[in-house]
């Protein structure tokens, strides 16, 4: 048996094929892992204005996003259906800080304390566009939501419940 293995028989081809497949799988897994970050890592590594949702057709991923929204505890302030409560309704036509992907991602990851005009983020250009009677600042969820992909799915659900952002309206 050792003779066949060392001599290049069918065993060496099988081992070579297995090593090739293992290498390909390992490389792919490493590549996929490199693409996924925590929300805080994504914010830190991406210049302002550059964050863009990988789910432009948000209706297809909305159900999964809603499950993640509930699991992260967003419903405690915004309500289970996004209609508000002690925080702003996600169904409003005007969102307090704006509705672009980059702003929504940073707002959820960093909280409103980092977006207020009086601090460094406010000096970077974040201004309130709407006003709501809210109980207090939104806490940051960048360390609660595990991956940037999970946060993008939550944003997809938020957009899906907002009349102004749905293609078919309300």
Task: Label every PLM stretch briefly.
Residues 74-77:
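Short cysteine clusters
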Residues 1-10:
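N-terminal secretory signal peptides that target proteins for export/translocation
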Residues 15-24:
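Bacterial N-terminal signal peptides
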């Amino acid at each position: 048996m050792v003779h066949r293995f060392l001599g290049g028989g069918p065993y060496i081809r099988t081992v070579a094929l297995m090593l090739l497949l293992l290498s390909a799988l390992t490389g792919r897994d490493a590549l996929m892992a490199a693409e996924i970050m925590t929300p805080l890592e994504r914010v830190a590594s991406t210049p302002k204005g550059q964050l863009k949702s990988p789910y432009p057709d948000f209706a297809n991923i909305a159900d999964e996003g809603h499950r993640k929204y509930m699991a992260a505890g967003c419903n405690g302030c915004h309500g289970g259906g996004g209609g508000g409560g002690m925080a702003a309704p996600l169904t409003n036509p005007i969102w307090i800080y704006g509705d672009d992907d980059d702003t929504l991602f940073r707002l959820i990851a960093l909280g409103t304390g980092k977006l207020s005009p009086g601090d460094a983020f406010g000096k970077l250009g974040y201004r309130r566009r709407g006003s709501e009677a809210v109980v207090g600042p939104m806490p940051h969820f960048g360390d609660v939501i595990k991956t940037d992909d999970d946060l993008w799915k939550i944003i997809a659900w938020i957009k899906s419940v907002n009349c102004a952002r749905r293609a078919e309206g309300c």
